[in-house]
Amino acid sequence: MDDVLISYCVVTGSFLGFQLLFSAISPRLFTKYSSTYRQLSFGKQCEWDSRFVSTNHALIVGSACLYILAYDDAVNADPIWGDPFWVKMNVAITCGYLVQDLLLLARFWKVMRDPYMVCHHLAVFYSYGYVLNRGVLPYFANFRLISELSTPFVNQRWFFDVIGKPRSSWPVLLNGLAMALVFFIVRIAVIPSYYSQVFATFGTEGYIRLGIGPQVAWIVSCVVLDILNVFWMYKIARGFYKVVKAKPDGKPRRNHAD
């Protein structure tokens, strides 16, 4: 079977799997085992289920990224045209998740409004379309997906807020520290290294073979994603600083965007 067809089968399966997780597994699981979940409004339950799906996606894709980075010699040897099969499968899983999440945001926009996440998803789609259809830039696509490793900590911070865990408590502080460190490492600290590798490909035969479409999609999506990452890093650092500086008995104002 053609790799492109396999990729789109994985996209479809990923979409259906994550939708099942959102609409059936998560509600039943947490209705049975979480009294907090049962007391939430419909909108908050939707966001809870969405973040549960997001965490599962991040763990699956992030783990696969690390494996590919460590053991896929073909991709590491030729970052533009190396054998992209496993990267394409991982990207397909992400694309299926993004479709599910975008449809979810559209359906529940009034209660889950997040324009920054929509911009993020569309930028990812723009670039990953070339990975799925042409199998180009596998190393750089995989490198980008490693950023998902920070997502579970971001979601856990939200879960702590919802269950009423004080932001000055040790579990919340430790998660906040881990979130800030991992987010910085996988999304911010890697920026110089990433772009140095990008610039190193300019003018090479492999880069020229890409053509203008993939070249523009690659650079534009990277710039958009990194602007968003820097913005989110600032908000995370600011929020963590506020919590650390707050009085132990203080109750900082909760803001989903913090």
From Swiss-Prot:
One Pfam family per UniProt: TRAM_LAG1_CLN8
Swiss-Prot/TrEMBL keywords: Membrane, Transmembrane, Transmembrane helix
Compartments reported by the entry: Membrane
Transmembrane segments: 5-25, 52-72, 85-105, 116-132, 171-191, 212-232
Topology relative to the membrane: Multi-pass membrane protein
Major subcellular location class: membrane
All copies of domain TLC, residue ranges: 43-245
Domain of life: Eukaryota
One GO cellular component term: membrane
Keyword rRNA-binding in record: no
GO BP field: lipid homeostasis
PANTHER family per record: CT120 PROTEIN, TLC DOMAIN-CONTAINING PROTEIN 4-B
Family of the protein in this entry: Belongs to the TLCD4 family.
Name of the molecule in the record: TLC domain-containing protein 4-A
Species in which this protein is naturally found: Xenopus laevis (African clawed frog)
